[in-house]
């Protein structure tokens, strides 16, 4: 912490939407300034490469842990201030701007799913929903954190790094 008592706290929530919900439920009472989710994901677009960034501007909730508290039909909007801050962070780290930055950082829908092995099962259902939503990435926590941020009025955002591409045969 800084002398003024302000600072950044990093929380390793583990894996999965249940952990994300439990952690954010408990952290919300401390009234944090923001919940930036930083993690890894499965890239869904052929144009993505391992190591590329995904900046969520929408969320597809297939986590099933907040359905009773916040129905899935409630939209979870992206927050401009957080989006800009996360994009600037990537800009500073990569030293890229404009089109060069867009080549390594896609913006789009991030789908959060509760089944770690979704790509090993019959893909017709999940893949069709991911395609219809125009999702660029799949993870197991982002939409849960964003939904709880929306629910508790804590600003949220998501920046992920592509660690695998299961639909294209590129694994970690």
Indicate where each model-derived feature is located:
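Active-site rim beta-loop-alpha module in soluble metabolic enzymes
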Residues: 73-132
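Metabolite-binding pocket within alpha/beta catalytic cores that recognizes anionic/polar moieties
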Residues: 1-85
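Short glycine/serine/threonine-rich phosphate/pyrophosphate-binding segments
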Residues: 18-21, 140-145
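Gly/Ser/Thr-rich active-site loops/lids in small-molecule metabolic enzymes
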Residues: 57-59, 130-135
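Short acidic/His/Gly/Ser-rich catalytic and metal-binding motifs that mark active-site loops
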Residues: 62-65, 118-121, 166-170
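Short acidic/polar active-site loop segments enriched in Thr and Asp
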Residues: 33-34, 136, 155
